[in-house]
């Protein structure tokens, strides 16, 4: 039998698989007997991060943060997220509240072989994160809260009507014209996909029971007792955040008074610091406050905190170099494959 040879005029390309189209949703039966939908993206040897998205988000909302996917992989961070009750493709169970969800999350982490885990909550993910870390505080490596509810913020009654959100879910996600998210190519389009997935993945006529329950839990459930938490905590807030104002951060700092804490308050920024400073959150997960993400001259650097003021005074900015590109700059052209 003749040996198989490459065609004499063939170019060899490096591609051997499909490129990612966002996190892959998996399902597993956990200890309670319930089936959970989850994502698990990253190597087994990477730092595990449990991600809890904002109010009404599905497990694929993490895709909105994958504009820094290569940076996350370079740092070596594995992301696990568990879809909340009745959202996305998860079946609604009226018996599943904050504590039941927390138990299912820990059961899944046990199955995945994850012991110590960093926990990140964005916005409406805050109360769920509190229930999770209160259940097993000794297994929390670090806690990261990005403009996260401690309890239902005041002045949000009009925003938290499930039927109103269901009538126009995209409006729930609408960012101001000056928001930094508009600098991220494709972000607004991806937001529309997430908004509709959150409410209509099971069909147009399925009632928004999961979202309704979440809104009720925000109002009725007090912040869990976190006095047993010893892991370092990192808080990220915009000083101009009107949806989750700084008073909410104060509730967290009081509840976590016994922990080492880093507060990152960004002047004049609003309810989008979770995107604009996602790179810093990743760095804090990896280095536990030991590095600041900053860039200058098109180069991203991880500097020590003591150098931050001098670096910024010399023309640097916080964040990866992509944030230095003008918002109206055209997309970078595809550079083409490297053939050999």
Language-model region placement:
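Catalytic active-site module of serine/aspartate enzymes centered on a nucleophile-bearing elbow/loop
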Residues: 259-340
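Conserved HGGG/HGGXW glycine-rich cap/lid loop of the alpha/beta-hydrolase fold
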Residues: 34-89
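Conserved hydrolase catalytic core segment
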Residues: 116-154
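Alpha/beta-hydrolase
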Residues: 163-224, 315, 319-330, 335
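Acidic catalytic loop of the alpha/beta-hydrolase fold
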Residues: 239-244, 272
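Conserved acidic catalytic loop of the alpha/beta-hydrolase fold
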Residues: 100-117
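Flexible "cap/lid" loop of the alpha/beta hydrolase fold
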Residues: 143-171
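Short beta-strand/loop motif that positions the catalytic acidic residue
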Residues: 229, 235-237, 241
């Amino acid at each position: 039998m003749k040996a198989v040879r490459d065609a004499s005029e063939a170019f060899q390309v490096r591609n051997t698989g499909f490129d990612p189209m966002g996190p892959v949703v998996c399902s597993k039966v956990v200890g309670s007997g319930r089936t959970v939908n989850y994502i698990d993206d990253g190597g087994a040897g990477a730092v595990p991060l449990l991600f809890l998205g904002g109010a009404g988000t599905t497990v694929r909302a993490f895709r909105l943060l994958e504009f820094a996917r290569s940076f996350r992989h370079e740092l070596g961070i594995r992301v696990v997220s568990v879809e909340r009750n009745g959202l996305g493709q998860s079946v609604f169970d009226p018996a599943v509240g904050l504590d039941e969800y927390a138990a299912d999350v820990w059961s899944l982490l046990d199955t995945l072989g994850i012991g110590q885990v960093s926990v990140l909550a964005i916005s409406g993910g805050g109360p769920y994160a509190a229930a999770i870390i209160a259940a097993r505080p000794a297994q929390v490596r670090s806690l990261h809260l990005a403009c996260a509810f401690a309890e239902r913020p005041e002045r949000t009654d009009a925003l938290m009507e499930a039927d109103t959100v269901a009538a126009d879910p995209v409006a729930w996600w609408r960012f101001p014209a000056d928001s930094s998210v508009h600098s991220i190519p494709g972000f607004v389009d991806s937001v529309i996909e997430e908004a509709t997935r959150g409410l209509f993945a099971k069909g147009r006529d399925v009632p928004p029971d999961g979202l309704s329950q979440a809104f009720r839990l925000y109002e009725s459930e007090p912040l869990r007792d976190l006095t047993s938490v010893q892991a370092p905590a990192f808080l990220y807030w915009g000083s101009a955040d009107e949806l989750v104002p700084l008073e909410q951060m104060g509730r967290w700092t009081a509840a976590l008074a016994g922990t080492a804490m880093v507060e990152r308050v960004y002047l004049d920024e609003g309810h989008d610091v979770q995107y604009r400073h996602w790179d810093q959150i990743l760095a804090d997960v990896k280095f536990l406050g030991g590095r600041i993400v900053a860039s200058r001259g098109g180069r991203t650097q991880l500097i020590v905190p003591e150098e931050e003021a001098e670096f910024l005074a010399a023309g640097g900015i916080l964040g990866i170099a992509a944030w230095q590109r003008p918002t109206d700059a055209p997309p970078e052209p595809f550079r083409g494959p490297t053939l050999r």
